[in-house]
Curated annotation (Swiss-Prot):
UniProt-listed Pfam families: Cystatin (PF00031)
Gene: CSTB
Annotated site, Reactive site, chain positions: G4
Subunit architecture: Able to form dimers stabilized by noncovalent forces.
One Gene Ontology molecular-function label: cysteine-type endopeptidase inhibitor activity
Name of the protein: Cystatin-B
Superkingdom field: Eukaryota
Keywords, alphabetical: Acetylation, Cytoplasm, Protease inhibitor, Thiol protease inhibitor
Localization in the cell: Cytoplasm
This protein's record includes keyword Hydrolase: no
C-alpha cells in the first residue's frame, strides 16, 4: 500500500468488523439512535500517520452508513475514533474518500 493513497475496496474481515464495533457507540451517539444491525461489508484503508479505514456498514435491511475511522500508530496508545460518516447510503453506493 502506498502512503496516502486509499487501497482498493476489499470485502470486510473480522478485523474490519472489530474496528467498526469499536466506534458503533460513537455513531449511535452522533445520530441519536441505536443500530440493531451493524455489519461491516467492505472497506478501504489509507496509510497516513496511522491508518484511516473507510467502511461500508449495514445498519438495517436496506440502510447503509459509510464510516471513516482513524487508528493511530501503536506507540500513541489511543483508541480508534470515528472521524466522519455518511448516512442514507445504499448497498450499491461506492465507498469513496470523504
Amino acid at each position: 500500500m502506498m502512503c496516502g493513497a486509499p487501497s482498493a475496496t476489499q470485502p470486510a474481515t473480522a478485523e474490519t468488523q472489530a474496528i467498526a464495533d469499536k466506534v458503533k457507540s460513537q455513531l449511535e451517539e452522533k445520530e441519536n439512535k441505536k443500530f440493531p444491525v451493524f455489519k461491516a461489508l467492505e472497506f478501504k484503508s489509507q496509510l497516513v500517520a496511522g491508518k484511516n479505514y473507510f467502511i461500508k456498514v449495514q445498519v438495517d435491511e436496506d440502510d447503509f452508513v459509510h464510516i471513516r475511522v482513524f487508528e493511530s500508530l501503536p506507540h500513541e496508545n489511543k483508541p480508534v475514533a470515528l472521524t466522519s460518516y455518511q448516512t442514507n447510503k445504499g448497498r450499491h453506493d461506492e465507498l469513496t474518500y470523504f
